[in-house]
């Protein structure tokens, strides 16, 4: 198992193909749905709750796919993509911890948007504080997170929940 504390884009793509933590580990999406370019830090003892943290980044440029369709003459990154990136990172954390199975977002307590990501921005930073992980019959991670654009916080989410399942056919 890879217990590195940072990951580059190639490693994140490898995770999407089941080649980073193993073929049975939770996977990140690939191509356009991978909303992360790098994980700057990941650990299991830091953060606001002392149970782990992740700091990750996405480079922004005007050529990103969503700016061309959301919206015409008013391009903005969809807020749901930033929220999905937070869920992606909780699932990645569970795989990094050694969980096996397929990751699925299970919910979120509260989400607030107080700004937007526009084509002229340079960088989105995700900061997650792990609140709890459960490794029993159910494997689940719970985290609070914020999204910053060029250093300014514009999204927050509490109680992001991701589960890891051995069988999702009846989910």
Swiss-Prot record:
Active site, UniProt feature: 70
SUPFAM superfamilies per the UniProt record, alphabetical: Thioesterase/thiol ester dehydrase-isomerase
InterPro entries assigned: FabA, FabA_FabZ, HotDog_dom_sf
GO biological process, one term: unsaturated fatty acid biosynthetic process
Molecular function terms from GO: (3R)-hydroxyacyl-[acyl-carrier-protein] dehydratase activity; trans-2-decenoyl-acyl-carrier-protein isomerase activity
EC number: 4.2.1.59, 5.3.3.14
Keywords: Cytoplasm, Fatty acid biosynthesis, Fatty acid metabolism, Isomerase, Lipid biosynthesis, Lipid metabolism, Lyase
Pfam families in the cross-refs: FabA (PF07977)
Role, per record: Necessary for the introduction of cis unsaturation into fatty acids. Catalyzes the dehydration of (3R)-3-hydroxydecanoyl-ACP to E-(2)-decenoyl-ACP and then its isomerization to Z-(3)-decenoyl-ACP. Can catalyze the dehydratase reaction for beta-hydroxyacyl-ACPs with saturated chain lengths up to 16:0, being most active on intermediate chain length.
HAMAP family: FabA
Record's protein name: 3-hydroxydecanoyl-[acyl-carrier-protein] dehydratase
Provenance organism: Shewanella sp. (strain MR-4)
Lineage: Bacteria, Pseudomonadati, Pseudomonadota, Gammaproteobacteria, Alteromonadales
